[in-house]
Amino acid sequence: MNPAGGDAPRLVLATHNKGKLRELRELLRGQVPGLDVDTQVVDAAAAGAPDIVETGVTFAENSLLKARAVAEATGLAAIADDSGLAVDVMGGAPGIFSARWAGTHGDDAANLRLLLSQLSDVPDIHRGAAFVCAAALAVPDTDGRPGHEVVEYGQLEGVLLREPRGSGGFGYDPVLQPAGEDRSCAELSAEEKNAISHRGKAFRALLPAIVEALRRAEA
């Protein structure tokens, strides 16, 4: 049960990335009865959760590690994702290292420059890639220990452009052109991107578990 009621947080997204929080709120808007996504879905900083070191070797391991740690720290249902870009000719790299491919975590511009330079000689026909996401939900037991856990997956396939295009989104959005599209992910509206994105697919697959977890917490 949520004893605070009102606008108290009910769901924590285990990230400090405002772009991811914005995407999750839009995906959840209107999907969970009685949930005010603008006040009750918060990020790790707002919930007072600690930073989590990603020590897993797969997207699923990292997402579960983060969700579990935040659920234990806050006593609330927690969601985490680990996502990245998998480039065919690079054997799936950058993969779990996508956010720090150039060395500094979250330096999108440097990551893009390095990736494009590494692929400069790769012909268009071999520039296939995909955004991959593993999204995890962790619901603590009443004593604060790990309880129910669920992991779902999503993928967005496309090709890598030779130059960044568009100003929307974040990360590698400016260089991935989804299959069947003539625009980059960064040129899509938020609604268009959420409808096809890897993160959108993973979180939509997770929605039934989220709804059930929040319903049980209010019972």
Predicted features and spans:
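Anionic-ligand binding patches
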Residues: N2-V12, K18-A219
